[in-house]
Regions:
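Polytopic membrane enzymes that build or remodel cell-surface glycoconjugates and lipids
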Residues: 1-443
């Protein structure tokens, strides 16, 4: 095992990418033959504009208004729409092509995780590779990768991670070209998925954690981050002009607003449980805003305080640990039902694909702890701790890979997808309707 770690440390970026590519193909090859399911039919098969590449219409035509009988929401995602239409030009209605693109994007994202953790974690190549592999093979990622519609998560993350990576390089080299690239990629991410609104705050938090003493660099931070906030303001203006209301206008006046707010700690606790102990994974995961909340709230804050204590205890990795916590929390703000997402009675959507990007924050935190408690430097390569750690990692990775391959199989059709959902969401009326429709369609 020490020799293996030593060999990994000598690998270059091309070899690292090939390892990730090989693992990604193994894990997700079973989804390539799967057909379009559920809302993929709405956005691709039944989309009357799927073959139209009129850029003006894509960017300036208001999205379809939502109604109680439609899966089409008031999303403003022109880059995503453009990509779907380009994929149609290439693959037509052959679902295999769309699946292959998803798999490739996921592999690229894992490679970007490797690059970013290398920079933030102090050039620990083996540790960065381990974290990238976990991102690649984690079972919770199946919903974003095996589902063709999950490309919104994959593409937004790709553009966002590239934007952040270019910003890191810009901070190191002070190249205006890298800064402009970072800004443009952020703009592109906004045009793919609304969750990208957190990036300016993520970059500001990065400066708070990693920059020189904040009080001595306020002017520099404002100068470097102002462009992101200007782009964000412009995005909200465009979105408001086309859709007619901003994303957050229905939050504060909603009588159920505080019911949803008190649900947030429990939702975060649930997501942490799914990340560290992935089990009972399924589509259309829901949370009830009327459920008891005191125990889950107390439990979450106990964990958060414990993580904060660890961050300040682990001196050499303090900044990375704090940044990892912040990444996890900040990146979930758009999906924590502050504005309700797909509500049925008192139930709110708590989808597993919401964790695709926040998982990076958890990996940064775990990586910081790992580099402190199980150092992977050359002088420690022969320690028994590393040998035991390597065995644990291998066994855990094998379990994760098997679980992900199994989880993928539920996306082979509408019937297995909604049968799986209703195993855990027995009172989900819409789920029963969707399963009945699937049975009818299949005779």
């Amino acid at each position: 095992m020490p020799k293996l770690f030593s060999s990994l440390n000598r690998l270059g970026s091309p070899q690292i990418f090939l390892i990730l590519f090989f693992l990604g193909v193994i894990i997700y090859s079973n989804v390539v033959s799967y057909p379009f399911v559920h809302d993929e039919r709405i956005f691709i098969l039944q989309n009357p504009s799927i073959g139209d590449l009129n850029i003006k219409d894509i960017f300036l035509t208001p999205p379809a208004a939502p109604n109680d009988f439609s899966l089409v929401n008031t999303y403003y995602r022109p880059f995503l729409e453009l990509l779907n239409r380009l994929l149609y030009k290439v693959f037509g209605f052959n679902s295999s092509g769309y699946h292959l693109v998803n798999i490739l994007l996921h592999i690229l994202n894992s490679f970007l995780v490797f690059q970013i953790t290398q920079i933030l974690g102090g050039k620990r190549k083996t540790l960065s590779l381990i974290l990238a592999v976990v991102f690649l093979i984690h079972p919770i990622q199946s919903e974003a990768v095996a589902c063709i519609s999950g490309i919104s998560n994959l593409l937004f993350t790709l553009l966002g991670l590239f934007s952040f990576l270019f910003y890191l390089w810009f901070s190191e080299k002070e190249s205006i070209f890298l800064h402009i690239l970072s800004l443009l990629l952020f703009l592109a991410a906004l045009f793919v998925k609304e969750q990208a609104v957190i990036f300016p705050f993520l970059i500001l938090f990065y400066e708070f954690c990693f920059a020189p003493p904040f009080n001595s660099s306020v002017a520099r931070v404002i100068k470097q981050t102002a462009g992101f906030f200007i782009i964000l303001a412009g995005y909200f203006w465009i979105r408001t002009s086309l859709i007619g209301f901003p994303i957050t206008n229905m939050a504060a006046a909603d009588p159920e607003f505080w019911l949803r707010i008190r649900l947030i700690p429990g939702s975060l606790l649930m997501y942490l449980g799914l990340i560290f102990f992935p089990h009972h994974l399924h589509y259309f995961r829901r949370v009830d805003m009327l459920q008891p909340f005191i125990f889950s709230t107390v439990s979450f804050f106990v964990i958060l305080i414990g993580a904060g204590y660890l961050a300040f205890f682990v001196k050499g990795q303090r900044r990375l640990l704090i940044f990892g916590i912040g990444w996890f929390l900040l990146s979930q703000i758009p999906t924590l039902n502050i504005v309700p997402i797909v509500m049925e009675y008192s139930f709110l959507l708590a989808a597993e694909h919401f964790m695709y990007f926040p998982l990076v924050g958890i990996l940064l935190f775990v990586g910081g702890l790992g580099s402190y408690f199980i150092p992977l430097s050359q002088e420690n390569m022969k320690s028994k701790v590393n040998t035991i750690g390597g065995i644990v990692l291998f066994l855990s990775g094998s379990v994760f890979m098997a679980a992900t391959i199994k989880q993928n199989t539920y996306w082979r059709g509408d019937i297995p997808l909604f049968e799986r959902t209703l195993q855990f969401e027995k009172n989900f009326g819409r789920g029963h309707l969707l399963l009945a429709q699937a049975y009818t369609a299949h005779g």
